[in-house]
């Protein structure tokens, strides 16, 4: 059966960027059609990404915290793992959120078309669904088609023992020996889950550090905390994987790589994602898509075709849901006639590992590469009352200031709940705040969050919770 729909705005993809664009456009009085290949809204993030991974990370945290309490006088028995119940709980979390999105979509009178959509011209999209095709004629389009996992040619990807992040979240079993190929955020998060559930986890990373985007000192703290949990192989690459009945035999290459093949029960491939620009036939609408699949846009999120916009992973790094949401609002508002540009000073990044790593703005490495005149202030959590009371003193809070003006250029936190704390630094960077603004803000005590204010006091020279390197020297 073939249907035809005419609309003012069509949004291609219903991830965080897509549904946010659709909802914002509807709130601004526009007729909106939202096209999604999945049966539920939310895209990769909600269905097979951000949300289910955080549910499983919560399980991992409870297991690890319970074990850690033994040294503080509280001993629990060995946890009994019921994978069916864990999976069921994870699916309940997803269902609650997707159900909420479905309800909000109906309340806003956004029409959802389920199926895979492709452009057939600069004014039409053809959607192929299980119940037939739908032709959508539009005045404006927003491409929010996201990204896909990258496959490696030397990996037997058709072997069920080789999984990507989606497969890892299915939690079919807990392998005894697991290799995580890629030491980025996704790989480390899933490695954290499987380690807590009982797997021996090895991580191989081609770069000389895990999470290459973060500063080395932040990652070093993570490494030191996890050196007994993971077998980490840096500056190492996988060159071959041989599938045998009893396991996957991996050949490594690198200065510290194992000389012989190593057997694993399962391999998680987490080497990044690629944009889906070519999958939606954007070229048939006249939209320029580069060879990698990215679509170039203006600050208004316009493509080279003025009435077609693009947002999210498909327009470039960083591939983050919160970036996509803000781009979505911008595109919808521009279509409605408002003046709006996507021009953030900073976009936060968080690794929901244990400990968490979070950073925003200019990193110390980037500042040095750019020749910026900076001063770095580090507050060690070994001096934090809350961290000591929580038996988690491994962390630190780091602030990066412009040396002459004191303006906050960036910051990073490593430690428990680092991601929840990062917002203050993000706001400081976005608003152009300086160290005095942050230091004179009264932070509650005892909290981990007060470490941000204390780092600012280090720069200001007013710190009293640590020896003050800027204190006035007294005459003898």
Range-by-range predicted roles:
Residues 2-7, 23-31, 36-174, 207-211, ...:
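Glycine-rich flavin
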Residues 3-15, 174-184:
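Beta1/beta-strand and adjacent pyrophosphate-binding region of the FAD-binding site
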Residues 10-17, 21, 26-38, 44, ...:
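Flexible, glycine-rich terminal cap/loop adjacent to redox cofactors
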Residues 10-12, 117, 136-146, 180-181, ...:
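Short hydrophobic core segments
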Residues 17-21, 44, 162, 187-190, ...:
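Short glycine/serine/threonine-rich phosphate/pyrophosphate-binding segments
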Residues 158-175, 261-335:
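FAD-site-proximal beta/loop scaffold in flavoenzymes
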Residues 172-214, 320:
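Rossmann-like NAD(P)H-binding beta-loop-alpha module
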């Amino acid at each position: 059966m073939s249907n035809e729909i005419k609309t003012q705005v069509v949004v291609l993809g219903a991830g965080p960027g897509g549904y946010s664009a659709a909802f914002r456009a509807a709130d601004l009085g526009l007729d909106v059609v939202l096209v999604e290949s999945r049966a539920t809204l939310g895209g990769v993030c909600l269905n097979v990404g951000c949300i289910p991974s955080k549910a499983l990370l919560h399980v991992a945290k409870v297991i690890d915290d319970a074990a850690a309490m033994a040294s503080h006088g509280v001993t629990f028995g060995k946890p009994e793992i019921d994978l069916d119940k864990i999976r069921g709980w994870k699916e309940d979390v997803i269902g609650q959120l997707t159900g909420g999105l479905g309800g909000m979509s109906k309340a806003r009178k956004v029409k959802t078309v389920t199926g895979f959509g492709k452009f057939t011209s600069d004014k039409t999209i053809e959607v192929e669904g299980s119940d037939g095709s739908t032709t959508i004629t539009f005045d404006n389009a927003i491409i929010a088609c996201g990204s896909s996992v990258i496959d490696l040619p030397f990996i037997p990807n058709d072997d069920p023992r080789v999984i990507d992040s989606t497969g890892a979240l299915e939690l079919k079993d807990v392998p005894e020996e697991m290799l995580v190929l890629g030491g980025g955020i996704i790989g480390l998060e899933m490695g954290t889950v499987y380690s807590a559930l009982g797997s021996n986890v090895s991580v191989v990373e081609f770069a000389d550090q895990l999470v290459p985007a973060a500063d080395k000192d932040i990652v070093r703290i993570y490494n030191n905390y996890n050196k007994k949990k993971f077998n980490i192989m840096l500056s190492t690459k996988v060159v071959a994987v041989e599938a045998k009945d009893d396991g996957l035999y991996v050949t490594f290459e690198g200065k510290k790589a194992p000389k012989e093949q190593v057997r694993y029960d399962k391999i998680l491939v987490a080497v990044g994602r690629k944009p889906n620009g070519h999958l939606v036939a954007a070229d048939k609408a006249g939209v320029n898509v580069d060879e990698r699949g990215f679509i170039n846009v203006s600050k208004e999120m316009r493509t080279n075709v003025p009435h077609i916009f693009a947002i999210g992973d498909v327009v470039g790094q960083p591939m983050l849901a919160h970036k996509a949401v803000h781009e979505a609002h911008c595109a919808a508002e521009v279509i409605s006639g408002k003046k709006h540009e996507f021009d953030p000073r900073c976009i936060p990044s968080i690794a929901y590992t244990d400990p968490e790593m979070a950073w925003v703005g200019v990193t110390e490495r980037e500042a040095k590469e750019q020749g910026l005149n900076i001063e770095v202030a580090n507050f060690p959590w070994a001096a934090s009352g809350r961290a000591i009371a929580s038996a988690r003193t491994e962390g630190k809070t780091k602030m990066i200031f412009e040396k002459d003006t004191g303006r906050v250029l960036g910051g990073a936190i490593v430690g428990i709940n680092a991601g929840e704390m990062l917002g203050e630094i993000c706001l400081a960077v976005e608003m152009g705040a300086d160290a005095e603004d942050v230091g004179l803000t009264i932070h509650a005590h005892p909290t981990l969050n007060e470490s941000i204010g204390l780092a600012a006091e280090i720069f200001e020279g007013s710190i009293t919770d640590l020896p003050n390197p800027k204190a006035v020297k007294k005459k003898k």
